Amino acid sequence: MALIRKTFYFVFAVFFILVQQPSGCQAGLEFSEPFPSGRFAVCESCKLGRGKCRKECLENEKPDGSCRLNFLCCRPRM
């Protein structure tokens, strides 16, 4: 009985830890605008993967070209 309870708590703890981890592009969703298809612009890269398509560039980024639907290609400032 105690082994079943410990196993349940272990599985619950692992599940809780995994749910807390953001995956892929979800970490930056507060800076994104959804496309009509449901995809988020922050997930798309531009300039050979060196920039991100955003509606507005962050303070530590500079605009470098444009993406579709009036989005800017934002690259980190050097």
Curated annotation (Swiss-Prot):
Top-rank taxon, per record: Eukaryota
Record-annotated membrane-spanning stretches: none
Alphabetical keyword list: Antibiotic, Antimicrobial, Defensin, Disulfide bond, Secreted, Signal
GO cellular component: extracellular region
Name of this protein: Beta-defensin 105A
Gene name tied to this protein: DEFB105A
Family, similarity comment: Belongs to the beta-defensin family.
Cell compartment(s), UniProt: Secreted
Coiled-coil residues: none
Extent of the signal sequence: 1-27
Example of a GO biological process term: innate immune response
Annotated function: Has antimicrobial activity.
Species annotation: Macaca fascicularis (Crab-eating macaque)
Chief location bin: secreted
Cysteines engaged in disulfide bonds, as pairs: C43-C74, C53-C67, C57-C73
